[in-house]
Every structure is written in C-alpha cells, then in structure tokens.
C-alpha cells in the first residue's frame, strides 16, 4: 500500500500555515515544511516559520536543520521528506506536506528522478567567478540558451541551482530538464491548493511584509550577518534578506528596501501560482470563499477517513 500524504500548496501569504494547523488538529496530522529556506536556523521571520507555540501544538519537520551557510539540495530534501512521511505514517498520523517551493514538493510527491552527475569543483569555480564578474543574470541568460525549460523554473538570483544546471550541461552535453523525470506518485496523495483574487493576495502580502518588519526582520538579518558567513551563501538571496542586507550596507534606503521586499514577494507569488497551475492533481480553493474550509475538510475526510478525530 502507498503511504497517505496530504499536500497543501499555494502562493506566499495565502494562508497555508493556518490551514495546515487546522487540518493537522482535525486529522491527527504532522506537518512537513515544503519551503526551501525554512530548513535554515535563524531564518525565522523572513521565511514565515510557524511560531514556537504553533510548533509545540503540532509536530513540525524539516525546519531548523542546517546553518545558513550549509548547502542543501533538492535530492537531500527529497530523501529526508520521504523518510519523514514514512515515519509519520508508522505512527498512524497523517503526513501533511505544506509549502510553496514547487520543485521541492514535486520532487517528493512524484517519482522525480534526479540527474546523477558528480559535482565538478573546477567548473563550479569558473561559473562562480563569471557570476561575480558579470552578475547572476549573466549566468541565467546562459542557462536560457542551453536549457530554457529549466531556466524558466529558476529566479536569476538562485545562483546555486543555476550553476548546477550549467555544470550538468557542460559535463553531459544534455540539459538538466531532460535528465529529471516525473512519473507516478509513490504516495496516496491529496493535493489542496489555496488561492485568492490577485489584488487581495497582493494586499495580504504587503501587510505580511509590514508585520515581518514589526516582528524584527532587520534585527534577524543583522544577527545573521554578524556570523560573517551568511552573505556568502545562497540563503542570503532569499526575498526579505537580500533587500535588508542592501539597506544595512547603506546601498538603499529603508523605504526602498521595504518596497523591494513587497514587490519581490508579489512577483514570487505570481511565479508560484504559475508553477502550481501546471499540476492537474491540485484541488483549488479560493481562500476568501466562506465555504472553502468546510469543503476542504469534507474532501480530506473523504480521502483519509481513518485519521479523523
């Protein structure tokens, strides 16, 4: 029998955390983070981790596992998340995978075969130097030329994955997108997608950024910078962190940083929706619909009746 798995996806700021907590309480669930940045210690406010209180009421997994200067690959995430799903299922609890990092979530839910190509330090060094000299956009444009399919999935600032894709192409002569294959899911999965009208979502995102700033995002970034290692790592390019770094270094004003965070978050939400709209298995619900939660609850109960309180 395939292990059961509830998957909750959607754009940033739409309310995935609140829904996952509610469903976890109703269906004896445990939550697995599907966010590529929540694995890092000290990156709490900017990644919108569940609060310590929320984490104390419902078990959470794949959060606060690594230092921000440690590397973490999709393949590592796939292996860890699948292990957690089996462990949770063995406790007769419902595994709930929640997040907005499409590539990570798809890699877990589907039989996503990763390209098995050994890293080449010389190629990586060469590409890193090119990025330092000409900027991240230069490498992203190069990737668009050799692997447009994979380039569309990556933000120009996602330097680590851009370098990996170019490295694979240089070593094999084949685009990475042709070496990653998706087939049937090894899980009995139910996909729930949350959305809302775009203008309302954008307003919600703007308010959430204001809340993050009030909670101490600037202080969080200053503490990370004080380690002396954070700025050199890909994690420092996450939305909210890269803008605050530029403000702290005196390159932009506070108002410019706030505006950039909000704009970057809205653009990210748009990309997330585009990614998830490709997945036909997702049952979409409008968060603003007063009947949405009841309908979601019925859907989950129908799929996974044995977990009901």
Please give the residue ranges for each predicted region.
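Phosphate/pyrophosphate-binding catalytic cores of soluble transferases and nucleic-acid-acting enzymes
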Residues: 1-309
């Amino acid at each position: 029998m395939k292990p059961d798995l509830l998957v909750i996806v959607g754009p940033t700021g739409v309310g995935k955390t609140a829904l996952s907590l509610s469903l976890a309480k109703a269906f004896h669930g445990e939550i697995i983070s599907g966010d590529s940045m929540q694995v890092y210690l000290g990156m709490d406010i900017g990644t919108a981790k569940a609060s310590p209180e929320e984490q104390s009421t419902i078990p959470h997994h794949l959060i606060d596992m690594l230092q921000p200067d440690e590397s973490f690959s999709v393949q590592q995430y796939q292996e860890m998340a699948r292990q957690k799903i089996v462990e949770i299922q063995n406790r007769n609890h419902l595994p709930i995978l929640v997040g907005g990092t499409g590539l990570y979530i798809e890699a877990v839910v589907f039989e996503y075969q990763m390209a098995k190509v050994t890293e080449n330090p010389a190629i990586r060094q060469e590409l890193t130097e090119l990025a330092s000299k000409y900027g991240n956009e230069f490498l992203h444009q190069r990737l668009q030329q050799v692997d447009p399919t994979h380039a569309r999935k990556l933000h120009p600032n996602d330097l680590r994955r851009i370098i990996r894709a170019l490295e694979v192409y240089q070593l094999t002569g084949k685009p990475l997108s042709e070496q990653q294959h998706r087939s049937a899911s090894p899980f009995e999965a139910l996909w729930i997608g949350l959305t809302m009208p775009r203008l309302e979502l954008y307003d919600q995102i703007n308010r959430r950024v204001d809340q993050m700033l009030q909670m101490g995002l600037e202080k969080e970034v200053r503490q990370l910078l004080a380690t002396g290692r954070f700025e050199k790592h890909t994690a420092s390019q996450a939305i909210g962190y890269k803008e605050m770094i530029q403000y702290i270094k005196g390159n932009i004003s506070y108002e410019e940083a706030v505006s950039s965070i909000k704009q970057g978050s809205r653009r990210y939400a748009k990309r997330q929706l585009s990614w998830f709209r490709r997945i036909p298995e997702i049952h979409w619900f409008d968060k603003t619909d007063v009947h949405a939660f009841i309908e979601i609850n019925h859907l989950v109960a129908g799929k996974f009746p044995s977990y009901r309180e």
